[in-house]
């Protein structure tokens, strides 16, 4: 792998990990792997770049300035739970993360019910996140 690719993967993994951390609080490895898998599944299905997906404030509440989760995006990179998110993101970028969310491409927290979810059945419920195909 070229040095510039290593650096690009590091930067992208950091961005993915920050969003995953803010959305999951890194409650468990299972939920971190599931949300990271969902991001990858969405990139395969919609042919969107991962950076476009993790920049979508309509999908990730933490990206909204007025979200209570927004400040979690600034987590210290030495934080243990963030490091877990970072390692999972690197596994995904290197093709070493199996699908941990049953091919899901959407999610929401169990305290919300978006309109798009009312006509669908969820395929996984992991630590308060519901995943959909």
Outline where the language-model segments fall.
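Bacterial extracytoplasmic/cell-wall-associated proteins, especially those involved in peptidoglycan
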Residues: 2-133
């Amino acid at each position: 792998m070229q040095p510039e690719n290593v650096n690009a993967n590091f930067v992208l993994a950091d961005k993915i990990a920050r969003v995953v951390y803010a959305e999951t609080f890194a409650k468990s490895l299972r939920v971190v792997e599931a949300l990271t898998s969902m991001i990858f599944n969405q990139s395969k299905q919609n042919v969107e770049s991962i950076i476009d997906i993790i920049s979508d404030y309509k999908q990730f509440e933490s990206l909204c300035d007025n979200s209570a989760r927004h400040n979690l995006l600034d987590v210290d990179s030495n934080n243990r739970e963030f490091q877990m998110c970072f390692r999972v993101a690197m596994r995904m970028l290197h093709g070493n993360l199996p699908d941990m969310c049953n091919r899901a491409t959407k999610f929401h927290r169990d305290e919300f019910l978006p309109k798009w979810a009312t006509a669908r059945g969820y395929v996984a419920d992991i630590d308060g996140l519901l995943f959909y195909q």
